[in-house]
């Protein structure tokens, strides 16, 4: 017992024994279990007195952590916090810390100076007499819609015209409407005064205000000489296109047709494209990209664009950057009902469109003179039209936008946004003339807004009034000579007027500017074409740049109305097309077809009409058309009844809505400029009828061939092709367009006509 006692005690013997004696060490070792038990008991005892052990603390920590996790899950699951609203407010309210603090402490503003400071503290503590309050006007930027803050760029010089605008809007013709758009591939954007609404723009259909019934009149060899509406389907709807077909509403034209008429017709192919919901439903997913590129131009034609050109072209939009300012969309009355407006808008932003429509309709009923309520209603109807793909609802939205702009005391920015959006939606429905009237009124209200004038020029082009458009762009360039958008459009008009050399600098400088709306395949197309015609070898540099920027499938294949993934090669064999029966029938009956063509040439009432698309450098070239855009010309077929009867058996050609069937006669001394057709959706057959022994040839891409009587040549006219007729007598061929063999039956039914 002594060793244990010594070990427990504090004497020196214990110390020496444990350190120096082996016995002590053994003794100490034998006594350790008891010591450990006592220590353990002592530890438990101390733990009860002193608090939780380490393991108990960790257990409670984990319980609390898990409780927090499950609480967070419950908050998200039961939607206790509206995170979308939080994020929206975080984005919209860009106030710095001092502004936030002033907002919080503003209620303690005792001296009426608009903020909380030392003087306010003195007043509250009774150290200073509180002054009489002065009437103050709350800052407009604190009272505007948070959901519309980023929609507007202030126009220079337009800050003091709100009162003036109402009087002018009241005098507007009630038949004019408009609305704001986002990126109409691209809505032509302007400089600082351009408003920037946050609403998306729908894909639209090519709709012109004119439609000429097909007779025996001139039929145009389709080229890219006209400014078309692109047939690209909206990404949001691309999956629906294959399954849905609706009738198109097109009040300004009897059928959706892409018209190739450089002299008269402009149709937009920007990312801003036009097609109403009914037409959009049976569109297909088109693209300007075709996968195969079998041919490239010669080495000398593949030189890259000069570095300075590449640099400018690769940085579009930087030049035109302007500082955005917050819009002034609430008048004094709307500020008093801002909470109600925000609550309704919250429903719209959360995708509860039907509820939002009802909420805004109730606000319009309660406050009929509120521009904000009316504008919100128009936006909801706009969204609902997109959701339901309804032209009828969209027409209601168009009317409501006009109502919002026409209300008393409507803020200037709201007027501009409402009318711009209405104009865009009118174009979407094909109401080109109504949209033009709206744009005219916008320019009348905002004469210093260059972007609106540029839009007005496009409006004139869309109805074929190139002369008026030219005047608009001349006015723009006189004020802003470096406006790239105005330059490319002015250059386009000059080229359409056959002022080839004069058009080149405008097209070139406009593209190089990098301004919004200038990076467009049509402008690369026309610039290269103009350069080719004046012998400028830089043409292929611009074609190459257009290809690099995704506008052309290749340097050779420069069509703009394309379906992605179709086999692409310049020359085809009958077996490759799958239309061997048609080819055999044409070749077996070539003399019958020839004789009816020759008989038509002898008639005096003009069945053959001159080509009028400015494709000829020189010479005489005429055509006699039997089918166009998949429609039979009954009057023309009276002049070639057997030929028409023969072709009725082959729907791949008679039903080709993107092609023609026609006789073509070319007289000696004719040269047709290099050109391309508008689409990759067709192939073109040439049946030789009367072919001189030498002097007639056709080049497609980099291969040149000649015709033979009674034989069919097949090529893809979306590739560059060129024709020479240097024989001593006329050349007569029969042209038969067929659908590209890889198009599906649905695509053949639904693709808009060209």
Curated annotation (Swiss-Prot):
User: Which residues point to the Lumenal side?
Assistant: 78-754
Q: Molecular function terms in GO for this entry? A: metal ion binding; peptidyl-aspartic acid 3-dioxygenase activity
Read off the Gene3D superfamilies from this record: B-lactam Antibiotic, Isopenicillin N Synthase, Chain, Tetratricopeptide repeat domain
Q: Does the keyword Zinc apply?
A: no
Q: Where is this region: Disordered?
A: 1-48, 176-197, 247-326
Q: Which residues bind Fe cation?
A: 675, 721
The protein's name = Aspartyl/asparaginyl beta-hydroxylase
Q: Which organism is it from?
A: Bos taurus (Bovine)
Give the encoding gene's name.
ASPH
């Amino acid at each position: 017992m002594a060793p244990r006692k010594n070990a427990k005690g504090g004497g020196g013997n214990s110390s020496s024994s444990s350190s120096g004696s082996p016995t002590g060490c053994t003794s100490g070792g034998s006594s350790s279990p008891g010591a450990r038990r006592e220590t353990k008991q002592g530890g438990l005892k101390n733990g009860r007195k002193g608090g939780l052990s380490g393991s108990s603390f960790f257990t409670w920590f984990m319980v609390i952590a898990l409780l927090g996790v499950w609480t967070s899950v419950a908050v998200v699951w039961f939607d206790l916090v509206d995170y979308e609203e939080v994020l929206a407010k975080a984005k919209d309210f860009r106030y710095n810390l001092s502004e936030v603090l002033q907002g919080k402490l503003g209620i303690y503003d005792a001296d009426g100076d608009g903020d909380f400071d030392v003087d306010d503290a003195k007043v509250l503590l009774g150290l200073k007499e509180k002054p009489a309050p002065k009437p103050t006007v709350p800052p407009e930027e604190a009272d505007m819609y948070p959901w519309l803050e980023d929609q507007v760029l202030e126009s220079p010089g337009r800050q003091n015209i709100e009162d003036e605008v109402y009087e002018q809007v009241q005098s507007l013709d009630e038949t004019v409407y408009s609305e704001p758009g986002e990126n109409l591939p691209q809505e032509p954007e302007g400089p600082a005064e351009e408003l920037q609404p946050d609403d998306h723009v729908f894909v639209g259909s090519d709709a012109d205000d004119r439609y000429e019934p097909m007779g025996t009149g001139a039929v145009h060899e389709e080229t890219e000489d006209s400014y078309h509406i692109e047939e690209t389907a909206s990404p949001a709807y691309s999956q629906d296109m294959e399954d849905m077909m609706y009738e198109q509403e097109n009040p300004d034209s009897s059928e959706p047709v892409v018209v190739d008429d450089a002299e008269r017709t402009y149709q937009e192919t920007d990312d801003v494209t036009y097609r109403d919901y009914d037409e959009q439903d049976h569109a297909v997913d088109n693209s300007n990209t075709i996968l195969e590129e079998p041919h490239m131009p010669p080495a000398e034609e593949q030189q890259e664009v000069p570095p300075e050109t590449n640099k400018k072209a690769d940085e579009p939009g930087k030049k035109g950057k302007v500082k955005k300012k917050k819009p002034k969309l609430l008048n004094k009355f709307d500020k008093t009902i801002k909470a109600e407006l925000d609550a309704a808008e919250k429903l719209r932003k959360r995708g509860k469109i039907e509820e939002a429509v009802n909420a805004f309709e109730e606000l319009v009923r309660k406050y009929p003179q509120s521009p904000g309520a009316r504008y919100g209603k128009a936006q909801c109807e706009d969204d609902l039209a997109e959701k339901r793909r309804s032209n009828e609802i969209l027409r209601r939205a168009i009317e409501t936008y006009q109502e919002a702009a026409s209300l008393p005391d409507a803020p200037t920015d709201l007027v501009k946004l409402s009318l711009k959006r209405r104009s865009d939606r009118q174009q979407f429905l094909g109401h080109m003339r109504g949209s033009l009237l709206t744009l005219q009124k916008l320019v009348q209200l905002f004469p210093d807004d260059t972007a609106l004038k540029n839009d007005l020029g496009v409006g004139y082009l869309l109805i074929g009034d190139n002369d008026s458009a030219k005047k608009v762009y001349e006015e723009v360039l006189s004020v802003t000579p470096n406006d790239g958008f105005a330059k490319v459009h002015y250059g386009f008009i000059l080229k359409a007027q056959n002022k080839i050399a004069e058009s080149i600098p405008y097209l070139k400088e406009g593209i190089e500017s990098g301004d919004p709306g200038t990076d467009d395949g049509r402008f690369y197309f026309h610039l290269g074409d103009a350069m080719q015609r004046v012998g400028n070898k830089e043409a292929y540099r611009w074609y190459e740049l257009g290809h690099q920027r995704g506008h052309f499938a290749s340097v050779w294949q420069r069509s703009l109305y394309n379906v992605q993934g179709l086999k692409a090669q310049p020359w085809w064999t009958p077996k490759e097309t799958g239309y061997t029966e048609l080819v055999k029938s044409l070749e077996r009956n070539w003399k019958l077809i020839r004789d009816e063509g020759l008989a038509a040439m002898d008639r005096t009432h003009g069945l053959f009409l001159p080509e009028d698309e400015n494709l000829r450098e020189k010479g005489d070239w005429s055509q006699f058309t039997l089918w166009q855009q998949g429609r039979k010309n009954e009057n023309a077929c009276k002049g070639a009844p057997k030929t028409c009867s023969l072709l009725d058996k082959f729907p791949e050609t008679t039903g080709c809505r993107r092609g023609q069937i026609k006789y073509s006669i070319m007289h000696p001394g004719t040269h047709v400029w290099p050109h391309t057709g508008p689409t990759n959706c067709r192939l073109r057959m040439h049946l030789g009828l009367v072919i001189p022994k030498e002097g007639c040839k056709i080049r497609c891409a980099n291969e040149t061939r000649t015709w033979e009587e009674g034989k069919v040549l097949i090529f893809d006219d979306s590739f560059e092709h060129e024709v020479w007729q240097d024989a001593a007598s006329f050349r007569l061929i029969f042209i038969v367009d067929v659908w590209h063999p890889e198009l599906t039956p649905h695509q053949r039914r639904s693709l808009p006509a060209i």
